UniProtKB/Swiss-Prot annotation:
GO terms, biological process: nucleotide metabolic process
Cofactor: a divalent metal cation
Gene3D superfamilies given in the database record: 3.90.950.10
The keyword Hydrolase is assigned to this record: yes
One Pfam family named in its UniProt record: Maf
Protein name: 7-methyl-GTP pyrophosphatase
Domain of life: Bacteria
Subcellular location(s) of the protein: Cytoplasm
Site label Important for substrate specificity, positions: Y32, Q90, E174
């Protein structure tokens, strides 16, 4: 279901870089990804990626998520060439049909009606880029989510309560949206929220970020 780490650049396929004090940048304006990255207790900056998120003709949800995650990391890295940059993207995959952020109440209603009683795969991709070292890796976490057979009333009341219009699939699993679900199957617990931290940790450490550096915070 989920892929292993997939090196994109040949320079990173053989060996990882020695951890240093490289700055870390999150190439995303998502408050959910920012909150997840804060769990690592690492200093980081946030930058907005300027990327066209329009799907290519015939592009699958998985390929779309992978392409956009890498495009976001590369776009931000151009302004932070010495930093380790994280890019991420998530696309809900309903039987091959990509479902992005609804943006409006009406679209969110339509999405949840489509997904009720169905199993949806949330394709969550993350990419890490450091321009000056040539480091580039990406990985994908595929989260299988089965929705309850929701009534129209439940859908309407949920959306009014949580307004998840900036979330792929029109639900916030970290909030009331968990009540919409029958089951979740994945191997990277934070992937459904938008950033697979297990994969992210592996890649930023390989790129030169010291996850367990002594920060001088002794009792």
């Amino acid at each position: 279901m989920n892929s292993a780490l997939n090196p994109v650049a040949a320079s990173t396929a053989a060996t990882a870089l020695t951890p240093t004090s490289r700055p870390l940048v999150l190439g995303s304006t998502s408050p959910y990804r920012r909150e997840l990255l804060q769990r690592l207790h690492l200093p980081f900056e946030v930058a907005t990626p300027d990327v066209d998120e329009t799907p290519l003709p015939g592009e699958t949800p998985r390929l779309l998520a992978e392409r956009l995650a890498l495009a976001k990391a590369r776009a931000v890295a151009r302004n932070f060439p010495h930093a380790v940059v994280i890019g991420s993207d998530q696309v809900a995959d309903l039987n091959g049909l990509p479902l992005g952020k609804p943006g409006t109440h009406e679209r969110a209603v339509a999405q949840l009606r489509q997904m009720r009683g169905q199993t949806v795969v949330f394709q969550t991709a993350v990419a890490v880029v450091c321009l000056d070292s040539g480091f580039e890796q990406s990985s994908l976490a595929a989260v299988r989510v089965t929705f309850r057979n929701l009534t129209d009333g439940e859908i309407e009341n949920y959306l009014r309560a949580e307004q998840p219009y900036d979330c792929a699939g029109s639900a916030k699993s970290e909030g009331l949206g968990i009540a919409l679900l029958e089951s979740i199957d994945n191997d990277d617990p934070t992937a459904l929220v938008g950033l697979p931290l297990i994969r992210t940790c592996k890649m930023i450490q390989a790129a030169g970020v010291a996850l367990f550096a002594d920060r001088g915070e002794h009792p």
